[in-house]
Amino acid sequence: MVWGSSAVAGAAASRLCGQLNANAKYPAVLGEVPETGHDQVMAFDGFFTRAGSSSDPSDPDDFFRDRVDDPEHGLHLVVLRDVEEHPRVRRRCDASAMMARDRGVAVTELRAEGTHPLERIATLIALADYVTVYLAIALGVDPTPVPAIEELKARIA
């Protein structure tokens, strides 16, 4: 899950989701605060969290445990933060991150740097592009080929 806390951070969050899909072949769900507080926080109690699981993730010898409980397969919340957050959005981001952590969801908060909106979005987008290529390499995925896009283009041509 990738959330943005302002118009600038929301645009960067959209870019991060797209790059996670394209470069790392890794699914991502986009959200912009405050709307995410009405629907996406429900995922904190869902299938991909320890709070929503009935098995014991601490027992690696449990043959029948669902591997979704392994930390690398769980839900991860990334919140892109901006200095121009509305105070209510700031409180919602802080509360949502705390709720996620309380439920065993990994949380990463990345803050835009700079004063001008263009500078702030550039810092977040540059970080997003770098992180997604790095993640692809860490997962053993070549980030350059896009066979699914090529296939889709061929099917609609």
What are these regions (language model features)?
Residues 1-157:
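A SIS-like phosphosugar-recognition module
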